[in-house]
Amino acid sequence: MEGSRPRSSLSLASSASTISSLSSLSPKKPTRAVNKIHAFGKRGNALRRDPNLPVHIRGWLHKQDSSGLRLWKRRWFVLSGHCLFYYKDSREESVLGSVLLPSYNIRPDGPGAPRGRRFTFTAEHPGMRTYVLAADTLEDLRGWLRALGRASRAEGDDYGQPRSPARPQPGEGPGGPGGPPEVSRGEEGRISESPEVTRLSRGRGRPRLLTPSPTTDLHSGLQMRRARSPDLFTPLSRPPSPLSLPRPRSAPARRPPAPSGDTAPPARPHTPLSRIDVRPPLDWGPQRQTLSRPPTPRRGPPSEAGGGKPPRSPQHWSQEPRTQAHSGSPTYLQLPPRPPGTRASMVLLPGPPLESTFHQSLETDTLLTKLCGQDRLLRRLQEEIDQKQEEKEQLEAALELTRQQLGQATREAGAPGRAWGRQRLLQDRLVSVRATLCHLTQERERVWDTYSGLEQELGTLRETLEYLLHLGSPQDRVSAQQQLWMVEDTLAGLGGPQKPPPHTEPDSPSPVLQGEESSERESLPESLELSSPRSPETDWGRPPGGDKDLASPHLGLGSPRVSRASSPEGRHLPSPQLGTKAPVARPRMSAQEQLERMRRNQECGRPFPRPTSPRLLTLGRTLSPARRQPDVEQRPVVGHSGAQKWLRSSGSWSSPRNTTPYLPTSEGHRERVLSLSQALATEASQWHRMMTGGNLDSQGDPLPGVPLPPSDPTRQETPPPRSPPVANSGSTGFSRRGSGRGGGPTPWGPAWDAGIAPPVLPQDEGAWPLRVTLLQSSF
């Protein structure tokens, strides 16, 4: 109840929707703004939405937090009446907050605003919270700015005028010339509501105070005009009056105490509804007198600025928006809200859908439909031109035959009249066919210009979709991918090899098609290559395959003609006229020649050292390039356009610049290679130890348990003369088998005799650890 509320609380200003706090110290002292101003209008304090009011616009917007990290959150916004509600999702179940738009300033942010997002705009108010919102696209931004601007201008003359916090004059109340007088401090504690809220709660508790039928008929007519015409959202043009003067923002709005016969409202409403200062677009003379109550004895003396008329308090015209907002039913707040599927406001949604992805999908579909229509028209015109061309050739042949007959008949005897008549008919028919052919050619050129424009527009659209695919939001990426697939499918259907596209080259001397070569279109980049010398930058990155375009279909994005230029069957050799103008250049190497050249360059590299042991020989034969010929063979890969791309796959040990690892084909082969590589690594490690003398004791005997490497039987010749063992000697340190601490049998089979030095290693035998490293890197 009002009696239990603290003395300092929120009060709602009537004309500007401002919030100020009442000072409990002195009624004359200017009040200060509430610190927790951002909590107003959120969740429990939000306005309750009227389901009977039409919805002007709804959609997704990004809202920036007012405090903390100022993160962006995606919310579902609905503009109903003059209030902007936002929800968590599109089901519109529980409102998260509301923004009363009259007297708000809606402005878009400039390009240099540090918002972190594009398409942002700001809704600010001198005494209220500033909302920073962002749309997804520029089209959505324009729609929201237009709708929110109309809702914010519904206040009337106060929009766009400077608002100075003027102090009340001595003869005026705190609300202006027509405001109520000052009240005492005792009344200030229990009278802290704005006139609109008090009027609303009193009218809702006692609906019998409403004006009789004339006023009700007037308000019903206003409601019908508001639902049918959007002109109510434009500012009204009328001469200024004392009521249209700006009210002080810091002055608290008070109302006089209720008359003795009136009862206090049962409870303060949960939502400050009817704060919208919407004045009906009618003259304020007799209607104001009809809609207002008679002045009470507590009202102050009339001011001089009123022109002799009784002073008008905001209590008089606060009833008008209340009747409009209630739509003839003052008890609608007690009714449960309708489910979203049965709301009448969804039917009254004006304009096209607001989803930008849906708009873009419709644009893509429309563009592809026009492109297909122009393609069919081009094909039909080409068929007619071919028929007329064939008929023209037949007529020319018939005329040639008739001319020969006439010449022969003239030499022999007099020319018959029938032959002359036939020649005349053939000539007339030939003239008619040529005229028709010229008309069809001009029509085809006109259609082709339209087709080229559509292709350019489609290329721009594909660039936009690819930009969204890489840098857009997740929803935009999904929609862009679907549209790109649709575009590629349509272009693939239009550019099939079984449908040669009709096109006449611009350099052709005759408008008529010249054979099969002129009946096919070429892409713009290929035409430019014929007229300009090819630079090394243009050749860089082109796959080996001559002049065939083996690149991906995305190369045609920037070109105007992207429909059929990607298929190699649709490509053709340049015409003789264009070929004579092109500079003579050295022919490109084919794929086979390039692969043969690469193979010769690899064979010129440093060969691997020949192993001396049988195991190394076996391993070398297993992993030699000759035995791995299937791995380096040329494999044709058929691309999407039917062309063959030549690839080369080889192990990392044979081609240092090839980063493709070698993978064994079968599990058995892999295990065999692993076992051989392990044996090779062990043997190389022991061989290195024996070469450096690290595994010999002081007598020169090998350490126990260390196997000796076998010797190559082909290299065992006449042993050199014996020599005493010398420590750290690489040539004589392997003698005296069985002396010292015998090591027992070794797993390597044959061993050297006592005193016989091992065979001398070749100079390049030290490269085997590199072979081991390369072999291990292959796995």
UniProtKB/Swiss-Prot annotation:
Pfam family, one: PH
Protein's recorded name: Pleckstrin homology domain-containing family A member 4
Subcellular location, record wording: Cytoplasm; Membrane
Polar residues biased stretches: 315-332, 647-663
Entry keyword annotation includes Glycosyltransferase: no
UniProt region (Disordered), positions on chain: 152-352, 492-670, 691-764
Domain PH: 54-153
Disulfide bonds listed in the record: none
Keywords assigned by UniProt, alphabetized: Cytoplasm, Lipid-binding, Membrane, Phosphoprotein
Biological function: Binds specifically to phosphatidylinositol 3-phosphate (PtdIns3P), but not to other phosphoinositides.
Membrane topology: Peripheral membrane protein
One GO biological process term: positive regulation of canonical Wnt signaling pathway
PROSITE patterns: PH_DOMAIN
Gene that this sequence comes from: PLEKHA4
Residues modified to Phosphoserine: S164, S559
Tissue-specificity statement: Highly expressed in melanoma. Detected at low levels in heart, skeletal muscle, kidney, liver and small intestine.
Pro residues composition bias: residue spans: 704-724
Bias (Low complexity): 525-535
Segments of skewed composition (Basic and acidic residues): 184-193, 536-551, 594-603
Domain of life from the UniProt record: Eukaryota
Keyword presence, Cytoplasm: yes
GO (cellular component) term, any one: cytoplasm
InterPro entries membership: PH-like_dom_sf (IPR011993), PH_domain (IPR001849), PKHA4-7_PH (IPR040392)
GO MF entries: identical protein binding; phosphatidylinositol-3,4-bisphosphate binding; phosphatidylinositol-3,5-bisphosphate binding; phosphatidylinositol-3-phosphate binding; phosphatidylinositol-4,5-bisphosphate binding
